[in-house]
Amino acid sequence: MTARVWTVEESLEVPLPPHAVYAALADVRRMREWSPEVIWVWPRGRRFVGVNRKAGWVWFGTCRIVVADPGREFAFDNITFGLPVARWGYRLTPTERGTLVTEYWTDLRRHGWRRRIAEVLGLVFTGTPPARRADHNRTGMRETLRRLRAACGPAA
C-alpha cells in the first residue's frame, strides 16, 4: 500500500518580478483565469468563497487568507462546513528572468472524526478519493502555473 501524500509542490518561472506576480495572486477573483477548477470567487476582506467544478461535480469552499506577504508568499486555508480541508499557497522567489512561483497544497484532513467527515465530504463533492487527491492536485497545479505564466507573460 502506498503512503498517503499530504503535501504537494510544483514550481514554474514567470517573467515578471515577485511584486507583480503577488499582485495577480492576491486578487483572488483572478484565480478562475488560471485554475482549471475554479469557476467563481466572491471575496470579502481576508475571506472568500470559491466555487469549483470538475467534470459533473460542483462544490464550494470558504477560504481564509493566512499568509499575505507581498512579493514573497500568499496562502489561504480552505474550510468546508467548518472543517479544515487544505492550505493552498504560493511562494515567490526572485530569479534573473522574473519569479519562480512555487504553488503548494497541504491536506489538513488529518485527525479523528473530523478527518473522516471531511474525507467523505471531499469524495461526495469532488469525486476524488483521498488516495488520488495529491496526484489530482499536482496535475491541476501544473496547469494553474502554466496559465499563470501565460497571463503574466509579455503580452499580459
Task: Identify the function of each model-found stretch.
Residues 1-44, 153-156:
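Hydrophobic ligand-binding cavity/cleft-lining segments
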Residues 9, 29-73:
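Short beta-edge strand/loop motif at the mouth of beta-sheet-based domains
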Residues 21-25, 31, 48-50, 65, ...:
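Hydrophobic pocket/interface hotspot
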Residues 5-11, 60, 73, 87, ...:
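Intrinsic-disorder/low-complexity, polar/charged segments enriched in Ser/Thr/Lys/Arg/Asp/Glu/Gln
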Residues 81-143:
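Beta-strand/loop substructures that line and gate deep hydrophobic ligand-binding cavities in soluble
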Residues 15-19, 66-72, 91-100, 154-155:
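A short, structured loop/turn motif at beta-sheet edges
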Residues 43, 138-156:
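Short, highly charged C-terminal tails/helix-capping segments
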Residues 5, 56-58, 81-83:
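Glycine-centered tight beta-turn/hairpin loop motif at sheet-sheet or coil-to-beta transitions
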